[in-house]
């Protein structure tokens, strides 16, 4: 195994930007690179905040050169929008239009596959926070297609299924681990919060045995703090089928198994902001 590659970061306040030194050109593929030679993200002693992506500068990569932006080719598959005092990122997918197809499926997503601080390995204990707004969202009615829209993933590299993801399901938001066949509703009804920012937190202990955990919390509009919604303890959280040494985060809009022929909503748009990775190993 190669010696660990050292990365230099300047971490500022949790609400501030993150500057990454020793950067390299972002790779085209979202599973590119290997983290076998890299130290655990949790080994960082700079700050509890490993990564803070807030789009304050109005750029799709939030000023982080290695951040992967959408592979969909439509001009509006991803764009920056005003949000409060600064900005957020929008992802859009229109079914039946090849401009919104990425890696063979209807999706438009950003990812940390080439950002060291956005990767995870066995042994890491990390917190993932993000804010999401469902923009001009058509709600589900009884009898309509029940296919869900994936809005955030903790993804194993190597073309594997995600370890976990959050998805809209009918008019709710659910947490799911597909390989472990775990699923729970964490937002019972998002309809009162359409066009508003909803905040999510996922704590994960990354293990390749049955000692890990997922803890999912939400902070809805009008709430002052996070509420724990679901805990899965004593589970194997790092479980790629294909060989993979690391995982990474993805956010945006992925619409698996959806088609116009099935009556799925033609166009969806979702906003994301304040994507953060925090080290829990010292807590």
Annotate the PLM regions.
Residues 1-29:
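Secretory targeting and sorting signals
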Residues 4, 29, 33-199, 204-283:
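Low-complexity, Ser/Thr/Pro/Gly-rich disordered linker/stalk regions
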């Amino acid at each position: 195994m190669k010696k660990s590659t050292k990365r230099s970061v300047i971490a500022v306040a949790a609400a501030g930007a993150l500057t990454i030194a020793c950067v390299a050109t972002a790779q085209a593929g979202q599973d590119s690179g290997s983290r076998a030679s890299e130290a655990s993200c949790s080994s960082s002693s700079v700050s509890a905040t490993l990564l803070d992506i807030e789009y304050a500068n109005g750029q799709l990569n939030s000023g982080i050169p290695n951040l992967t932006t959408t592979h969909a080719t439509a001009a509006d598959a991803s764009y920056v929008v005003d949000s409060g005092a600064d900005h957020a990122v929008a992802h859009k997918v229109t079914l039946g239009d090849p401009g919104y197809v990425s890696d063979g499926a209807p999706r438009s997503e950003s990812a940390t596959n080439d950002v060291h601080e956005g990767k995870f390995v066995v042994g890491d204990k990390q917190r993932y926070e993000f804010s999401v707004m469902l923009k001009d969202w058509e709600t589900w009615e009884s009898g309509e297609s029940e296919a869900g829209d994936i809005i955030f993933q903790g993804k194993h590299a190597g073309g594997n299924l995600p370890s976990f993801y959050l998805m809209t399901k009918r008019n709710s938001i659910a947490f799911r681990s597909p390989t472990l066949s775990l699923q729970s509703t964490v937002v019972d009804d998002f309809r009162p919060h359409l066009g508003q920012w909803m905040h999510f937190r996922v704590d994960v202990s990354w293990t390749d045995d049955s000692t890990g955990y997922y803890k999912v919390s939400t902070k809805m509009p009008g709430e002052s703090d996070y509420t724990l919604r679901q805990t899965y303890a004593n589970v194997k959280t790092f479980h790629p089928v294909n060989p993979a040494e690391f995982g990474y985060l993805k956010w945006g809009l992925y619409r698996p198994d959806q088609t116009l022929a099935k009556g799925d909503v033609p166009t969806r748009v979702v906003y994301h902001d304040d994507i953060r990775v925090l080290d829990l190993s010292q807590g």
